Amino acid sequence: MPELPEVEVTRQGVSPYLIDQEVTGLTVRNASLRWPVPDLAQQIVGQTIRSVHRRAKYLLIDTDAGTTIVHLGMSGSLRVVTELTPVEKHDHIDLSLASGKILRFNDPRRFGAWLWYELPIDAHPLLSKLGPEPLTDAFNPSYLFESLKGKKKAIKLCLMDNHIVVGVGNIYANEALFAAGIHPQMEAGKVDQERLIILVSEVKQILANAIKQGGTTLKDFTNAEGKPGYFAQKLHVYGRGGESCTQCGNLLSEIKLGQRATVFCGLCQTR
């Protein structure tokens, strides 16, 4: 599943082709995504794209008339192609530009989304209650300490809660907790400030490194040019249950937390 780094890599890849371009057409071949593509999505046609930014895992394409909201879901990707590029089986949506380029949305599992919103985008129900971005100053140890006070839920589940902080999905939550030496099942409210300082730092560093490396390639993700990411080569725990810990050699344990695979080292990560 594309997480924050993958969506940010996609944004960086498509932005130069979209900004200041007039939209000349929107072709919807299959409207049956996670939510049906609304007819209102056609309102972007004739508009000039002013900016392309990201909020959590949502890609936001801004015009004067409104914003197209794109979510990659479990297996979605965006590529910039030409009019001569053959349409493939799961190419559900084309956004055509005056330059002759096309922003093409491919989603084999159809858990992604393509929506339209005319009001200020922060008011959209999908975005209005989101927590801070992890790579901004708003996500800091003091904020996290206050947010976790009294919480008995496992720290890993809190780290993946978009109301607390956005975009820290399963891959990066596993990796950050390993780097910080924190057991994923530890009660969130019992993690002291000293450990939270380390955890916040590791979250920021791991996400920034993943973006720099072009995202993590696990099954479906490719960037806007169709190339894979390379951060998977640097994973210490995710997907490595039963293998040796890269720090101590102990066998890594794998459990389910919130129905998600959770891998950790019982020696290096403590409660």
Curated annotation (Swiss-Prot):
Binds 1 zinc ion per subunit. Its EC number is 3.2.2.23, 4.2.99.18. Transmembrane segments: none annotated. It comes from the Bacteria. Its cofactor is Zn(2+). InterPro entries: DNA_glyclase/AP_lyase_DNA-bd, DNA_glyclase_Znf_dom_DNA_BS, Formamido-pyr_DNA_Glyclase, FPG_cat, MutM-like_N-ter, Ribosomal_uS13-like_H2TH, Znf_DNA_glyclase/AP_lyase, Znf_FPG/IleRS. Keywords: DNA damage, DNA repair, DNA-binding, Glycosidase, Hydrolase, Lyase, Metal-binding, Multifunctional enzyme, Zinc, Zinc-finger. The active site is at residues 2-3, 57, 260. It catalyses: Hydrolysis of DNA containing ring-opened 7-methylguanine residues, releasing 2,6-diamino-4-hydroxy-5-(N-methyl)formamidopyrimidine; 2'-deoxyribonucleotide-(2'-deoxyribose 5'-phosphate)-2'-deoxyribonucleotide-DNA = a 3'-end 2'-deoxyribonucleotide-(2,3-dehydro-2,3-deoxyribose 5'-phosphate)-DNA + a 5'-end 5'-phospho-2'-deoxyribonucleoside-DNA + H(+). It holds the Pfam family Fapy_DNA_glyco. Signal peptide: none annotated. GO terms for biological process: base-excision repair. DNA binds at residues 90, 109, 151. GO terms for molecular function: 8-oxo-7,8-dihydroguanine DNA N-glycosylase activity; class I DNA-(apurinic or apyrimidinic site) endonuclease activity; damaged DNA binding; zinc ion binding. Monomer. Involved in base excision repair of DNA damaged by oxidation or by mutagenic agents. Acts as a DNA glycosylase that recognizes and removes damaged bases. Has a preference for oxidized purines, such as 7,8-dihydro-8-oxoguanine (8-oxoG). Has AP (apurinic/apyrimidinic) lyase activity and introduces nicks in the DNA strand. Cleaves the DNA backbone by beta-delta elimination to generate a single-strand break at the site of the removed base with both 3'- and 5'-phosphates. Belongs to the FPG family. This is Formamidopyrimidine-DNA glycosylase. It comes from Shewanella woodyi (strain ATCC 51908 / MS32). The lineage of its organism: Bacteria, Pseudomonadati, Pseudomonadota, Gammaproteobacteria, Alteromonadales.
